[in-house]
Amino acid sequence: MTQFASPVLHSLLDTDAYKLHMQQAVFHHYYDVHVAAEFRCRGDDLLGIYADAIREQVQAMQHLRLQDDEYQWLSALPFFKADYLNWLREFRFNPEQVTVSNDNGKLDIRLSGPWREVILWEVPLLAVISEMVHRYRSPQADVAQALDTLESKLVDFSALTAGLDMSRFHLMDFGTRRRFSREVQETIVKRLQQESWFVGTSNYDLARRLSLTPMGTQAHEWFQAHQQISPDLANSQRAALAAWLEEYPDQLGIALTDCITMDAFLRDFGVEFASRYQGLRHDSGDPVEWGEKAIAHYEKLEIDPQSKTLVFSDNLDLRKAVELYRHFSSRVQLSFGIGTRLTCDIPQVKPLNIVIKLVECNGKPVAKLSDSPGKTICHDKAFVRALRKAFDLPHIKKAS
């Protein structure tokens, strides 16, 4: 499988914004921390046959570097510091940190190395996997089909929102990691730019080239790594929240809630954190139940929910976003991040449900115990038990 050997990626910034935000925080706070991460396909797809093609793309990624115009653009943003950007200018992907193999038909990928470097692999590598697989599986699919599908959905969206005050509806593109292709994502984002409710993209390359607002704060790995960085497991989530505020005291203040379930998060999210963070992001579990819990928590702390933002980003499409908007729009500020249902929405194309998640920090296990049992990831069952005990979690959920 070498007929598509041309590089999929053309820019170091073709990644999610929160990767650079987290990388800067790691650079400043945890320079010597080492991590390991693993690829998971949550579906039944046997992707091992694409291992050689993916490995070839991994090798090509070492040639990506921050260009001068990209450096200047990042320098103009308010939250990046000069020491980090100067280091990023010299950064190169190291393919030796990545092993790719075909394990009896399953695609096996493991990453390991300094966290400050490994952190940048996840999103572009997932985008590479998605695009390579779709090139082979769906050679007939093209950008025009993706755009036609979007236009049809926008017609439905207009009908669905007729007569509804949409002034508080804000949509973001979160579609880099599972996109059909780089070209499809750019075409979809350009079309969405024509809509008044479209406010930005998580992709830094697209944000720069299309003059969009880059969107994103932190991911699960920030909280997972603190499970081993923090000397006290029960305090690890608070330590992660506090360290983020050290790096970004009054910016990038949307906190992800489901690394160790929403209930455990809210127990740690006291009045100081709730006041300083601008809002919360939903990524697993029932979104209405989650939103009601968030609003009730703010009210209990005597914080006006109208001053905070809830970001919904779990398996959304336009219809689901409108349903959530109808339910919550009068009580709290809202944003919606849609990924796969925008950038890999083509007839007869099956999107991949793929992730890369942290499994170790400094040689010790870390875990994600989200509000959706199927999203739990950890090899070490004893550590999962310890984590559940530390955070007083009920109901044992199977770790995968």
Curated annotation (Swiss-Prot):
GO molecular function per UniProt: nicotinate phosphoribosyltransferase activity
Protein's UniProt keywords contain Ion transport: no
Coiled coil: none
Catalysis: reaction(s): nicotinate + 5-phospho-alpha-D-ribose 1-diphosphate + ATP + H2O = nicotinate beta-D-ribonucleotide + ADP + phosphate + diphosphate
InterPro entries: N/Namide_PRibTrfase (IPR041525), NAPRTase_N (IPR040727), Nic_PRibTrfase (IPR006406), Nic_PRibTrfase-Fam (IPR007229), Nicotinate_pribotase-like_C (IPR036068)
GO biological process, one term: NAD biosynthetic process via the salvage pathway
Domain of life: Bacteria
Post-translational modifications reported in the UniProt record: Transiently phosphorylated on a His residue during the reaction cycle. Phosphorylation strongly increases the affinity for substrates and increases the rate of nicotinate D-ribonucleotide production. Dephosphorylation regenerates the low-affinity form of the enzyme, leading to product release.
Phosphohistidine PTM sites in chain numbering: 220
SUPFAM superfamilies: Nicotinate/Quinolinate PRTase C-terminal domain-like, Nicotinate/Quinolinate PRTase N-terminal domain-like
Keyword Ubl conjugation: no
Keywords: Ligase, Phosphoprotein, Pyridine nucleotide biosynthesis
EC number: 6.3.4.21
Pathway membership, UniProt: Cofactor biosynthesis; NAD(+) biosynthesis; nicotinate D-ribonucleotide from nicotinate: step 1/1
Enzyme class: ligase
UniProt GO cellular component terms: cytosol
Xref: Pfam families: NAPRTase, NAPRTase_N
Family as reported in the entry's similarity comment: Belongs to the NAPRTase family.
HAMAP family in the record: NAPRTase
Function: Catalyzes the synthesis of beta-nicotinate D-ribonucleotide from nicotinate and 5-phospho-D-ribose 1-phosphate at the expense of ATP.
The name this protein goes by in its record: Nicotinate phosphoribosyltransferase
Organism whose genome encodes this protein: Escherichia coli O157:H7
Species lineage: Bacteria, Pseudomonadati, Pseudomonadota, Gammaproteobacteria, Enterobacterales
